[in-house]
Amino acid sequence: MTEIGLSVDLATISKLLESAKSTLQEKQASDDDKHGQQKLLTKIPKIISSSFELPSYFEKKFVMGLKKDELVENSESYINDASFEPTVPIYESHVSAPGISKKKKNIKDTAGSNWFDMPATELTESVKRDIQLLKMRNALDPKRHYRRENTKSMPKYFQVGSIVEGPQDFYSSRIPTRERKETIVDELLHDSERRSYFKKKYLELQKSKMSGRKGQYKKLQQRRKPSYLK
């Protein structure tokens, strides 16, 4: 009997110890959670204190609200009704709403008021060739020297005109009517003196480019050969 009583006492004591241990663990975990929450609360700053005054636009009179008359009763009946049409007009994506003016279309592409609103000229092939010739005018006449042209791009705003000679100008400074053409390129091509000068310059450039190449070396070999091998 004594052994049975001792075993029962030991079992009850062990149960009590386990229950006490579990309660201590639960209490410790709850204390840790509270301590962590307090730490987080201390880190977060207070944005609005009791002494802080809200600005005027947060007051109730500026906040928009809904009136009871504006609320729709039985909204489900409107949703289920097939004949219901919205009062707000729906515009298509490619159609602009009325009252919106497209200002970009009315703006003209000009050089500005300082240049008397000079419009942008259309760049045709003949106009491009004339502009390229004007940029290379240093090569047209060996007796005239011009400032170097640095811009490679075509101008956007420009005008083309013809100089009208006065009666006091000497006849040598005028271009005869037979030699007048529509473009600058045509006038240069119809001038025989210019054409001979351009041909001479072209041959000089070709000679300098071909120097030291295969063709020149072959010609040199032919000249070095003796007369009986030629």
UniProtKB/Swiss-Prot annotation:
Compartment annotation: Nucleus, Nucleolus
Keyword presence, Nucleus: yes
Pfam families reported for this sequence: Fcf2
Entry GO terms, CC: nucleolus; nucleus
Region described as Disordered: spans on this chain: 209-230
Comp. bias intervals (Basic residues): 210-230
UniProt superkingdom: Eukaryota
Keyword vocabulary terms for this entry: Nucleus, Ribosome biogenesis, rRNA processing
GO biological process, one term: rRNA processing
Family, per entry: Belongs to the FCF2 family.
PANTHER family in the cross-refs: DEOXYNUCLEOTIDYLTRANSFERASE TERMINAL-INTERACTING PROTEIN 2
Record's function text: Involved in pre-rRNA processing and 40S ribosomal subunit assembly. Required for the early cleavage steps of 35S rRNA at the A(0), A(1), and A(2) sites.
Name used for this protein in its record: rRNA-processing protein fcf2
Annotated source species: Schizosaccharomyces pombe (strain 972 / ATCC 24843) (Fission yeast)
Underlying gene: fcf2
